[in-house]
Amino acid sequence: MPSKNGPLRVGIGGPVGSGKTALTDKLCKAMREKYSVAVVTNDIYTKEDAEALVRMQALPSERIVGVETGGCPHTAIREDASINLQAIADLNRRIPDLDVVFIESGGDNLAATFSPDLADLTIYVISVCQGEEIPRKGGPGITKSDLLVINKKDLAPYVGADLEVMEHDATRMRAEKPFVFSDMKRGEGIERIVEFLTVQGGL
């Protein structure tokens, strides 16, 4: 399902601290040997996430672009995605063989969604640390994303989150749409996410 004029564009959204940057890092490292990969990160007033990915050595620095959205970060991925579309166009010019571009949104709320003009597939990341009730609270990120990632499952015992309850609620809220439990520190769940992108993205 790559875009008509370029690479598969994968939007990665979720609240602050859910693990979006850690997921982006792990996906880049898992896919960079087989595919030509790049990243666009969104921050309100800095390029902190882009700089973090460079430090993590997710990809060479020329493949990572940070955009400063100002104001509300969800505007840059939904109502007016032009700043991100321009960043992708610039990457395409510099790296014409791109297969995949990950677009990491700024930390936002459960209502954040990507414009279909910007993302071909969307991943929404939540953390068990936000409470076991998060999946049943719903919102477009929970119910409409192509893949829901429930991250930091290793911390569930420490924050009183019941993974079985979260699994039940995610199944109910998402109907047939898939979700994955993950632990980015140990890389658990990454293989399933890569498989999802490969199959659903037509890579």
From Swiss-Prot:
GO terms for biological process: urea catabolic process. It comes from the Bacteria. Transmembrane segments: none annotated. Its main location: cytoplasm. InterPro entries: CobW/HypB/UreG_nucleotide-bd, P-loop_NTPase, UreG. GO terms for molecular function: GTP binding; GTPase activity; nickel cation binding. It is found in: Cytoplasm. GO terms for cellular component: cytoplasm. GTP binds at residues 14-21. Keywords: Chaperone, Cytoplasm, GTP-binding, Nickel insertion, Nucleotide-binding. PANTHER family: UREASE ACCESSORY PROTEIN G. Belongs to the SIMIBI class G3E GTPase family. UreG subfamily. Facilitates the functional incorporation of the urease nickel metallocenter. This process requires GTP hydrolysis, probably effectuated by UreG. Homodimer. UreD, UreF and UreG form a complex that acts as a GTP-hydrolysis-dependent molecular chaperone, activating the urease apoprotein by helping to assemble the nickel containing metallocenter of UreC. The UreE protein probably delivers the nickel. HAMAP family: UreG (MF_01389). This is Urease accessory protein UreG.
